[in-house]
């Protein structure tokens, strides 16, 4: 769904060298986001380039702005569709995430997304 070559180049320009597996995970994320968004409104941004830049690349800027030690535990309060924490997790697999949101429909989406990305063992979901 996303243009992985374009996204890889944009990420590299910001200092993020993405592996083939990471690019696959970003593509899976984008596909599932658009698919699920047809049933439940998660985002207004659903075009491939918009997802690459406004969701994924912008989310990765967290890793440039905040120094997170190896294995850091991070909580994303009001996570919505998982931005910026899930893209950061794709790049930094060592992070332990807790995603907290007030809408259960988002938690359901994130639960399925974490399974699809193989992150269910290092990601916790909380509905408040």
Positions of predicted regions on the chain:
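A structural micro-motif
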Residues: 16, 72, 95, 120-122
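Short alpha-helix immediately C-terminal to the canonical SAM-binding loop
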Residues: 106-108
């Amino acid at each position: 769904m996303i243009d992985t070559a374009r996204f890889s180049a944009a990420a590299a320009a910001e200092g993020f060298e993405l592996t083939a597996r990471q690019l696959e995970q970003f593509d899976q994320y984008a596909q599932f986001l658009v698919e699920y968004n047809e049933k439940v409104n998660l985002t207004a941004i659903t075009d491939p380039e918009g997802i690459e830049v406004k969701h994924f690349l912008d989310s990765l800027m967290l890793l440039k702005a905040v120094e997170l030690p190896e294995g850091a535990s991070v909580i994303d309060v009001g996570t919505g569709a998982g931005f910026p924490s899930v893209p950061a997790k794709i790049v930094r697999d060592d992070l332990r995430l807790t995603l907290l949101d007030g809408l259960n429909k988002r938690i359901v989406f994130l639960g399925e997304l974490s399974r699809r990305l193989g992150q269910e063992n290092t990601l916790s979901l909380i509905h408040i």
